[in-house]
Amino acid sequence: MRIRPGESHDRVAVSVYIDNCDPDDAKDVLDRMRLSTRQVKNTVRVHTDEPVRDTSYWKWVRESTAQLYIDLKLPPKTDADIRTPAGEIDADGIQGAIVIDAAACPIHVSNLSGSLKITAQGEPVSVHDFDGDLLDIRSTASTIDVARAVSSVVNLSSAAGTIEARSIQAVLNLDAHGSPVTLADIDGSIHGDLNASPLTLHGVPSSEVNLNAVGSPIEASVEPSFGADVQLEGRPVELDPSLTFRGEREPERVIGRLNNGGSGLKIRAVPGSVRCVRGGGV
């Protein structure tokens, strides 16, 4: 399913395309899929009636190379609730409050402004170039990839998947269970609860960082000039000796200041290791 802004300010346009087959076979594909479109008030449904699953149908499924695409053209500014049980969602250039709920369906969103809530399962989710009030992604067994997002709040929740977020300007909230997390260039505070989810942080956070982990190692890679009030707890704790630090060092606890201090950098991993190492820069 491809979702794009349309020219009409009060209508949704639905188009169906058949690719990777001869033109003469396209009608046969539509007949077998029994595709129909229906609108009830503000709800547009594109669905297939249950096909006759006889021997010829399954033979056709095995041998057919046809691909079906559904294009939705939304009004330039609109609120939409998009649900699909399968396929793929590709949304680009839309504005409004958007909700996407999909299982076993890759989701790719780019150049969206407004708010975006995604619930996904089992397939990749990517959101690039977002600008709005809220970005909320909740997934199971999925990879989450967020890049270049400006928002008041970004919430990322994953179970048995992965999270990668870079170039984010927002308050970032993380909830990860069995999901490795990689963060880079976060302009905003970071709050996270991690369970069996290793986390790696690159760059210099501009606001406080508060991370709590159970059974997960955490590594923060910071520039030598980075200033913060730090509190690190883990088994063990490693603070790069090349970083300028004043305070108390113990095998399982470090409290003090990096350079002249600054926002809070609080990392706790029980059980788990905590490493604060020198990254790039001078």
Each language-model region and where it sits:
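Intrinsically disordered, low-complexity terminal regions
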Residues: M1-V282
